[in-house]
């Protein structure tokens, strides 16, 4: 006799509801998991534009104010019209003016490039134009139309640009909107070109126009205006508090998510020309230099080797990577003994970065280490801040490890 298999009893709707909940949770986790990657895609494409613009602008300043010795209070155009320059010097000054103008244009394209590539990362190449348009409107917003009761006339006014905040919001929204429309709007094959070259671009452009004018520009402009007001009111103290916060967030996880978030904030202020990126750039290199230095001085200071054998060559590697702008060389030290490494390099990064900012070091160009050092204002002070932070890091980690070793809480295999 054949044995009939019993089928499992299925409760109608139960499995479907469970699957729906599971899919909803997966989509939420997928959204928040993928979003940082999309943002970093935009930042990585924006940085070369900023560097190109920054380097060319730096050429103009070096030629005009270092080579030709123009007084700092005089602009390049004023120097051209002064009649004091002729021949080769006049040609150099014309080139400086061209470099200044062209570099400024490149800087203006940084935020649109960021928004375009964030949208492209989310919604594909169909979302690229919408992101670019949104980024451009975040820096060059549409004039506001107002009715003046006193004159009974319509007039326009210039809103506060939403800049990086607006570009971030519109690029994400536009990217997902284009992605959704591309999936939902199904047309016959012979209308595919119409969909991709006309319908989706027009719909996304209209959406960007309305969203930027009525929502994002007012919101982002309000935030930017508030930030500028607070920083202006706080003056030097506000800049120093910002430097301390950015340095701490940059150093704490050595290239991890907190570091990336700090980079996002620093880039937004730098591209808006509100605050320079000095503190972040210094805080990137201090931890690996300081921990590498600790492996060199530990025996000289204490008479003992306080690191495991494999960390000594890694210390030299970390120092080399630091000069390339890579902080991840310090990760082995943080993993091996977080209680000694993390407080040490955080204190060093905060003190070194804040000291450099306080003493007048300024870096507007969004790169770190040797790639940006030639473009730093007050480079001597900047390097002194790095040295101070690295020395503090090295001394702290050496004496913390010595204290833990004496208490029997640290085992070392290189004695």
From Swiss-Prot:
Example of a GO biological process term: phosphoenolpyruvate-dependent sugar phosphotransferase system
Stated role: The phosphoenolpyruvate-dependent sugar phosphotransferase system (PTS), a major carbohydrate active -transport system, catalyzes the phosphorylation of incoming sugar substrates concomitant with their translocation across the cell membrane.
Entries under PROSITE patterns matching the protein: PTS_EIIC_TYPE_2 (PS51104)
Xref: PANTHER family: FRUCTOSE-LIKE PERMEASE, FRUCTOSE-LIKE PTS SYSTEM EIIBC COMPONENT-RELATED
Topology term for the membrane: Multi-pass membrane protein
Cytoplasmic side: 1-46, 123-126, 179-197, 259-276, 340-341, 400-415
All copies of domain PTS EIIC type-2, residue ranges: 35-415
Gene Ontology molecular function terms on file: protein-N(PI)-phosphohistidine-sugar phosphotransferase activity; protein-phosphocysteine-sugar phosphotransferase activity
Topology feature Periplasmic, residues: 68-101, 148-157, 219-237, 298-318, 363-378
Name of protein: Fructose-like permease IIC component
GO cellular component, as recorded: plasma membrane
Chief location: membrane
Keywords assigned by UniProt, alphabetized: Cell inner membrane, Cell membrane, Membrane, Phosphoprotein, Phosphotransferase system, Sugar transport, Transferase, Transmembrane, Transmembrane helix, Transport
Pfam families given in the database record: PTS_EIIC
Entry's localization field: Cell inner membrane
């Amino acid at each position: 006799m054949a044995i009939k298999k019993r089928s499992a009893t299925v409760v109608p709707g139960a499995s479907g509801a469970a699957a729906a909940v599971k899919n909803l949770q997966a989509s939420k986790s997928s959204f928040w998991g993928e979003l940082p990657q999309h943002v970093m895609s935009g930042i990585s494409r924006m940085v070369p534009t900023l560097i190109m613009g920054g380097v060319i602008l730096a050429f103009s300043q070096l030629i005009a104010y270092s080579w030709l010795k123009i007084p700092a209070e005089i602009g390049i155009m004023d120097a051209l019209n002064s009649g004091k320059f002729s021949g080769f010097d006049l040609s150099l000054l014309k080139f400086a003016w061209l470099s200044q103008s062209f570099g400024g244009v490149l800087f203006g394209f940084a935020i649109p490039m960021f928004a375009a590539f964030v949208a492209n990362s989310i919604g594909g190449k169909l979302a690229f134009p919408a992101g670019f348009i949104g980024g451009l409107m975040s820096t060059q917003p549409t004039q506001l139309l107002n009715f003046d009761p006193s004159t009974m006339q319509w007039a326009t006014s210039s809103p506060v640009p939403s800049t990086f905040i607006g570009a971030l919001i519109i690029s994400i929204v536009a990217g997902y909107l284009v992605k959704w429309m591309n999936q939902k709007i199904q047309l016959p094959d012979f209308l595919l070109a119409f969909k991709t070259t006309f319908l989706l671009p027009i719909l996304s452009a209209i959406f960007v126009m309305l969203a930027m004018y009525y929502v994002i520009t007012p919101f982002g402009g309000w935030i930017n205006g508030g930030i500028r007001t607070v920083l202006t009111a706080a003056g030097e103290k506000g800049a120093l508090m910002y430097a301390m916060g950015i340095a701490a967030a940059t150093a704490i996880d050595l290239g991890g998510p907190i570091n990336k978030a700090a980079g996002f904030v620093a880039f937004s202020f730098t591209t808006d020309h509100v605050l320079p990126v000095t503190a972040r750039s210094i805080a990137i290199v201090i931890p690996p230099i300081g921990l590498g230095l600790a492996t060199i001085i530990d025996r000289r200071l204490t008479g003992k080797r306080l690191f495991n054998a494999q960390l000594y060559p890694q210390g030299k590697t970390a120092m080399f990577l630091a000069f390339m702008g890579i902080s991840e060389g310090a990760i082995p030290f943080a993993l091996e003994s977080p209680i000694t490494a993390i407080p040490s390099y955080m204190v060093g990064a905060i003190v070194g970065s804040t000291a450099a900012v306080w003493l007048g070091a300024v870096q507007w160009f969004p790169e770190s280490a040797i790639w940006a050092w030639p473009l730093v204002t007050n480079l001597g002070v900047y390097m002194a801040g790095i040295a101070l932070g690295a020395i503090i890091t090295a001394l702290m980690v050496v004496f913390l490890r010595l204290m833990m070793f004496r208490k029997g809480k640290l085992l070392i295999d290189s004695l």
